[in-house]
Structure formats: C-alpha cells, structure tokens
C-alpha cells in the first residue's frame, strides 16, 4: 500500500512536471509568435514612415530646386538687362566721341584760319613797329640836338630828379611807420605784462640768516653748552652753524648763512631739547637724524613745487634739487618761491601769446635750478642748470630757456624770451630782493670754497658772521705741524684774494678718535 502510494505520487509528480513543461512550452511558443508579429508590425511601420520621409524629402528637394532655378533665371535676366544697359551706354559714348571728334576737326580748321590771319596781322604790326622805331629814333636825335644831352644823360637826370622828390617823402613815411610800430609793440608788451602781473598775487618775506630755538627753561642752556663747552662745540663742528647763547630768556640763536645747515642744526637742537639727553654721542645721532628729516622736507618741497606748476614726469633727483631751492636765497629772495613765481608769470605771458603754457611753467620753474648746488659745483648757476637739465633729459626748449635767461646765449624760442621777461619781472618788483644779504652770503661761500681747495681739508665752515673760518682736516693727511702751515696759507690767500671788513680768524681743527666696542 505504501509502495503503491509512493508510485502514484511519483507518477503524479512526473505527469505534473511533463504537463507543466508542455504548458510552459506552449506559452513560450505563443509569446515568441506574438513577439515576431510585433517585430514585423514595427518593421512594417518603419518602412511606411521611411517611405513617407523619403517622399517628403523628395518634395522638399524639388521645391528647393525649383526655387534655385527661379533665382538663377532671375539673376540671368538681371545680368542680361545690365549688359544691355552697358551696351547702350557704350553706344551713346561712341556717338558722343564721334560728335566731339567732328567738332574738334571743325575747330582745328577754324584755328588754322585764325593763325593764318594772325600771321598776316603780325607781319603788318612788325612793319608798323619798324616804321615807329624809325620815327622814334629821328625824334630822339632831334631832341638830343635841341637839348644838347644824350638819351642816357636825359634819363639819368630825370631819374635823379624823381628820386630826390620821392626820397624825402619815403623817409618821412618810414619814420612814421617805425614810430607807429614801436608804439604798438610797446603798448602790446605793456598790456601783456600788466595782465600777467595783475593775475599773480605773490607775497614775499626777506630771508634771515638766523633761526631761534625756544627752550623750556634757562637751565637747558647749560646742558646745551655741556662740560667745558663739549656739547656746543660738537654741535657747531657737525653742522657748521654758530650757536649764540646770550641773555635772551629761554632761547638759543642759530646763526649761519647756509639755510640747509641752519635747518639741520635747528631740527637737531629741537630734538635734543625734547629728548633731554645731550652729550656728544647723542648729538651726532640727532644731527644725522636731522639730515634725513631735512632731506625728506627738501624732497616734499620739490614735489609740491612741481605739482603746483603742473611739471609732471620730472626725474626724482631733479625734483629733489628743485626742493633745495627752498633753502637758497638770491638777494634775500627765496629762490624756490621766485622760481614758482617766474613759472606762473611765464605761463600767463605764454597764454596771452598762444604759446605752450605747460612748457613755459616747466622752463620757469627750472631756470634757476643751478643755484641749488652752485656752492658745491664749479661754474655759474646757468652752466650748472644747463648740465642738470641735459643730465635728466629735459626738453631742448627748457634747456635753452635756462641757458639764455641771463643772455649767455641767444634764445631760440618764444618760451625762452618769456622766461627771461618773467625772471626780470619777479626780481624787479619792489621789495623782492636785497643786495646786501646776497653779497654777504656770497662772501661766506667764497670763504668756504677757498678753504676747501687745500689738500687734506674735509670741510670748512664760515661762522661768526664770516669773522671766523673753521677748517676740519683729515688727521691721516694733516699732522700738527702741517695744520699750523695750513692755517697760515689760508690766511695769506684770504688776505690776497678777498675783501672783508675787520679780521677773519682761521681755525684748523684736527681730531683723532679711537673707538672700540666692548662685547
């Protein structure tokens, strides 16, 4: 029983598997058939769509072909019509040329006829002229016989009489025209100068050769002098400026003709007073610091001046030299202010005459630039200024304005003439300059230059208003014996070459320093 059940179950399973396989196969075959049918439908549909697209493209191609054909035919028709028009114009031109040719032929015939007539008339004129010349000669001979003069003598006499009659009239006319021209030129020049001067409002204060440093109290005077005068001697030696400490309450006077040195000394002394530490080593540091500060001030003054007159693209070194003019005076007149004033005047005159205002300003600012270093370099301030302008690539017009503003060379441009006129205007106005101060400063500069010309001299300072020249020498080159000889030589040369009131004390300073650093 159990075996039969197992067999039946096994048979049922086998039949179930076989039946399932048959059913699954039938389903698979049915799906494959459906898939083939679907694929065939898709292919058929694709063929139909392809046929439709092909037909559409063929239609579009035919339409485009038709459009191109129509356009080509239209262009051909247009070209044919254009060719016909050109052919018509050419035919018309040919006809015109033929007509003109006929006209020219006719004119040639007429001209030939006229030329023949002119030749006939010319022959008649020549015959008449010959007869006239014969008559004239007869008349001249008759006149010479009657007057007793030849033809040339008669002509010369007549010309001389006419010349005498006209010479006086011509002289009067020329004189009147010259007078009118001079009056017109003078009037125009006065109007130009008056206009320029009225447009410029410049103030001026005469430069001084002293500076005053205020002190917090009179005890500070003793600290400035130092033990046995060491501090004041160090400061005077380093700066070349006299320190005058007198009864003036809470003030020290700095005296010196070189404004740059005086400003360095003033700045150093102000810093020392503020710091409170005053001894030779500190003085040296402060003097060096003051030199740098004054250099910055000089550079800023140059930049401000160039900006004020619109002188752009100037070399930085030349700008700094322009700034040095702020510490230079000419007959008591500040040279930088004078240069700016000349620049403005030259610009105004140039504007009235239609010249380049910017170039006139630049030339006016630089016309006295040589004065900034004329006490350091040999030569006149004009020669030095020309060399500086060439060195720093200035315009030829600017160089000529510098060279010609004192008449050393001929001006080559209107700008140069205007700068010279502006320079004269600035210098000649009342109160602008003082002759005495300039002569005094030149005497001190000459005193220093003379002393520095000797070998072994490092620096020379004119102090005590020119009554003393202090000469700093190199201890390696000048010994104690040579220092006495040097003082005597300088004294002799001063007596031979300079004119001065009173006496001048010559002091030769020879200092040897031994410095070591403890580590």
Curated annotation (Swiss-Prot):
> What is the protein's quaternary organization?
Homodimer. Component of a possible RNA degradosome complex composed of cshA, eno, pfkA, pnp, rnjA, rnjB, rnpA and rny. Interacts specifically with RNA helicase CshA and enolase.
Q: Which GO terms describe its cellular component?
A: plasma membrane
Q: What does this protein do?
A: Endoribonuclease that initiates mRNA decay. In vitro, catalyzes the hydrolysis of both 2',3'-cyclic AMP and 2',3'-cyclic GMP into 3'-AMP and 3'-GMP, respectively, at the 3'-terminal of RNA. Activates sarZ and agr operon resulting in the expression of virulence genes such as hemolysin, DNase and protease. Contributes to virulence in both silkworm-infection model and mice.
Q: Give its localization.
A: Cell membrane
User: According to Swiss-Prot or TrEMBL, what is its membrane topology?
Assistant: Single-pass membrane protein
Q: Which gene encodes it?
A: rny
Q: How does activity depend on pH?
A: Optimum pH is 9.0.
What is the protein's name according to its record? Ribonuclease Y
- NCBIfam families referenced in this protein's UniProt entry, alphabetically: HDIG, RNase_Y
Where's the KH domain? 209-269
